[in-house]
A protein has these predicted regions:
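Conserved, well-structured ligand/cofactor-binding cores
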Residues: 1-158
C-alpha cells in the first residue's frame, strides 16, 4: 500500500514497454526482409556487385542494431522488475523473479541475434563497438538476475 502510486506508474511503464517490444518484432522482421532483398540485387557487373555488397552491409548493420535496442530495453525493464520485487506485494515476489528470468532471456536472445549479424560485417570498428556493448549487457543482465534471485531465495528459506 505504501508504494501503490509507484506500482501504478510502473504498471503504465510496463504496458508502454510491451507495446515497444511488439513494435520491435515488426522492426526486426523488416530488417531481415531488407537484408534478404539486398541479396536479390543484381550482380552482373562490378558496379552492381559493389552496390549490392554495400547495401548488404548497411542492411546487416541495421539488422544488428534492432535486436541491440531490444536487449537494451529488456535490460532497462530488469531494473523496473527489481523495484517491483523489492517494493511490491510480497506474495507476488516469485512472479517478479519469473519476470526477471524472462527479461534476462530476452536480453540474451536479442544479443544472439546481434552477434549473428555482426559475423558478416566488414566494418570492424562497428563490430567491436557492438560486441563490447553486447558482452557488457550480457554480464549486467546475468548479474542483475542473480542479485534478485539470490535475495529472494534467501528470504524464502525456511
Amino acid at each position: 500500500e505504501a508504494h501503490e502510486e509507484l506500482m501504478q506508474h510502473i504498471a503504465g511503464v510496463a504496458l508502454q514497454e510491451k507495446d515497444t517490444f511488439i513494435e520491435d518484432i515488426d522492426r526486426d522482421s523488416e530488417a531481415y526482409d531488407s537484408v534478404f532483398a539486398c541479396f536479390k540485387m543484381p550482380k552482373a557487373t562490378d558496379e552492381e556487385k559493389a552496390a549490392r555488397s554495400a547495401a548488404i552491409q548497411e542492411a546487416t548493420k541495421f539488422a544488428a542494431l534492432v535486436p541491440m535496442q531490444v536487449a537494451r530495453n529488456a535490460y532497462e525493464l530488469m531494473t523496473v522488475i527489481m523495484d517491483v520485487a523489492r517494493l511490491g506485494n510480497r506474495n507476488a515476489v516469485t512472479d517478479a523473479c519469473v519476470a526477471m528470468m524472462s527479461a534476462r532471456s530476452a536480453v540474451l536472445g536479442a544479443l544472439m541475434n546481434v552477434r549473428i549479424n555482426l559475423g558478416s560485417l566488414k566494418d570492424k570498428e562497428f563490430v567491436a563497438k557492438l560486441q563490447a556493448e553486447a558482452c557488457e549487457l550480457e554480464r549486467l543482465a546475468c548479474a542483475k538476475e542473480k542479485e534478485l534471485l539470490d535475495e529472494i531465495n534467501e528470504e524464502l528459506k525456511v
